[in-house]
């Protein structure tokens, strides 16, 4: 089961969501609003009982995917995180137990919204199976996003 989690100021009608809807018609692409807690409660309801999850999270959606995987690791197959806001909680905001699913992060070297060094610090600690791609792009990853091999990334 594939799911895309959009960023804080985006929606299920954003550029990435539209791309995924066209490319993967069976992908879940819900809308989220409200606080992190409200968003996570909605995500819990949407994914209740589902397994084999291949989660794509963009920015704040990357944080959501990370938190979900920490709480439900056996149900998550892989994470693909795009400029994820994993620095939002700071290094001490995550449990000591790492998330052992495969994780791919694509992060722009010119990201002025979510600093790459902070993401590297947190992600390196919580994702032992991390593949980090630093790309010549900004936070939105407009130059990079469509060039990725999504069929391989999402298996």
Q: Each PLM stretch: what is its role?
A:
Residues 57-66:
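Gly/Ala-rich beta-loop-alpha elbow adjacent to hydrolase catalytic centers
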Residues 16-17, 115-124, 146:
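Short alpha-helix in the alpha/beta-hydrolase fold that links the catalytic acid
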């Amino acid at each position: 089961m594939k799911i895309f989690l959009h960023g804080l100021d985006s929606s299920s009608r954003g550029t990435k969501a539209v791309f995924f809807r066209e490319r993967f018609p069976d992908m879940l692409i819900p809308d989220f609003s409200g606080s992190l807690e409200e968003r996570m409660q909605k995500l819990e309801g949407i994914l209740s009982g589902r397994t084999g999850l291949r989660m794509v999270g963009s920015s704040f959606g990357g944080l959501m995917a990370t938190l979900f995987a920490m709480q439900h690791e056996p149900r998550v197959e892989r994470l693909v995180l795009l400029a994820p806001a994993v620095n939002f909680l700071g290094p001490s905001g995550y449990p000591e137990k790492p998330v052992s699913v495969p994780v791919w992060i694509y992060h722009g070297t010119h990201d002025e919204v979510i600093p790459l060094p902070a993401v590297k610090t947190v992600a390196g600690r919580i994702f032992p199976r991390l593949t980090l791609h630093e790309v010549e792009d900004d936070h939105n990853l407009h130059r990079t996003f469509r060039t990725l091999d999504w069929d391989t990334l999402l298996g």
